[in-house]
């Protein structure tokens, strides 16, 4: 690791390297280190830097390794080896905990073990809400600094889209996409949600990718819509929408319902708020803690379509809730990361980070 006297600009290996959150929070004082063999196109994982052998082979090329997410494919043994390799390379480890509960897994034991090993070896830990920070302190013994999630949609673009869309009617949007593991798959949830909306003069717009057309949840909703059994339901099957098209589709709705059975935080929630939608979120995780304004995020009992409908109807009647003051979020996160990198690069902090042992647990593989 370089010392501040030699070069004050830290060289940072970010995992992932390419992601809207990483881009928005990147400190201008940091030099990005991007491996030649990064995933191509729209894929941002897997990152080769999670391989301990890669870290050892490229030791001396970076000062900081900053892990956000995208490590669920690694075993606990591999994560331990990765943290040891970072220490051997004298690269300080920084971790931002986005997911206390992994949205791509049902059994969370292996994820918790991996997260414990990463945070135990980290010179600095961040997370996105005060509730998540409290959970990290209680369950992992980790003091995490809270940074608010930055906006997803550029402010000028969001304003233009919202102006063009006009007032947005009485529809609630649910985007199933490819039905990630944490998405509710019981059709009854969506049928109950649609029914509750319909009774109040509103309706449900469900969007799913064409690649999921044969998924049992999608086929059940399609059958209900086609037969007239769900008069408050409109189902749209599309290819993956370009961002601009997605933003316009969302902006035509009044609220967005997050159909999650488990999770922690949501970039989707932030995107919806950027576009002026109120968000109806399950009461699991820390989604409510992301609210940028009072009543901007309304919670419902996880898994209950009727409760989701009640919350959505309330939000539709409540009307537009302007986006809170989020303009400074990206700059604040950039400064927090810059400070953490600078502190980690001081000789005393660097030595402490290298000496810090990873937490050794009974391995529970995925």
Task: Write out the residue ranges for each language-model feature.
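A charged, aromatic-enriched C-terminal amphipathic alpha-helix characteristic of glycosyltransferases
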Residues: 303-362
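Short Ser/Thr-rich beta->loop micro-motif in glycosyltransferases that lines
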Residues: 176, 238, 257-264, 282-283
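Acidic donor-binding loop of glycosyltransferase active sites
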Residues: 248-264, 274-277
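Nucleotide-activated donor-binding/catalytic signature segment of Leloir-type glycosyltransferases, i.e.
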Residues: 218-248
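Donor nucleotide-sugar binding/catalytic pocket of nucleotide-sugar-dependent glycosyltransferases
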Residues: 123-137, 141-159, 167
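Conserved catalytic-core segment of nucleotide-activated headgroup transferases in glycan assembly
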Residues: 164-226
């Amino acid at each position: 690791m370089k010392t501040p006297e030699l070069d004050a600009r830290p060289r940072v290996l970010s995992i992932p390297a390419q992601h809207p959150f990483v881009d928005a929070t990147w400190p201008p004082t940091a030099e990005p280190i991007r491996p030649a063999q990064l995933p191509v196109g729209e894929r941002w994982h897997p990152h080769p830097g999670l391989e301990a052998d890669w870290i050892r082979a490229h030791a001396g090329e970076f000062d900081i390794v900053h892990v956000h997410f995208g490590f669920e494919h690694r075993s606990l043994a591999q994560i331990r080896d990765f943290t040891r390799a970072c220490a051997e390379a004298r690269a300080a480890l920084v971790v931002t905990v986005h997911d206390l509960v992994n949205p791509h897994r049902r059994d969370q034991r292996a994820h918790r073990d991996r997260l414990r090993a990463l945070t135990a070896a980290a010179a600095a830990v961040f997370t996105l809400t005060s509730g998540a920070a409290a959970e990290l302190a209680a369950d992992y013994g980790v003091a995490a600094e809270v940074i608010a999630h930055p906006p997803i949609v550029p402010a000028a673009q969001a304003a233009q889209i919202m102006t063009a869309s006009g007032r947005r009617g009485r529809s609630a949007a649910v985007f199933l996409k490819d039905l990630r593991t944490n998405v509710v798959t019981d059709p009854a949830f969506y049928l109950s949600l649609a029914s509750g909306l319909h009774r109040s003069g509103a309706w449900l717009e469900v969007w799913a990718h064409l690649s999921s057309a044969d998924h049992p949840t999608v086929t059940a909703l399609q059958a209900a819509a086609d037969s007239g059994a769900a008069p408050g339901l409109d189902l749209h099957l599309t290819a993956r929408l370009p961002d601009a098209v997605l933003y316009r589709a969302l902006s035509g709705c009044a609220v967005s319902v997050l159909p999650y059975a488990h999770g922690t935080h949501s970039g989707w929630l932030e995107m919806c708020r950027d576009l002026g939608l109120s968000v109806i979120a399950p009461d699991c995780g820390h989604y409510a803690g992301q609210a940028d304004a009072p009543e901007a995020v309304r919670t419902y009992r996880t898994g209950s379509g009727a409760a989701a409908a009640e919350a959505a109807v309330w939000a539709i009647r409540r009307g537009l809730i302007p986006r809170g003051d989020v303009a400074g979020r990206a700059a604040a996160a950039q400064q927090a990361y810059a400070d953490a990198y600078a502190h980690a690069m001081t000789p005393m902090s660097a030595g402490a980070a290298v000496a810090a042992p990873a937490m050794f647990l009974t391995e529970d593989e995925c």
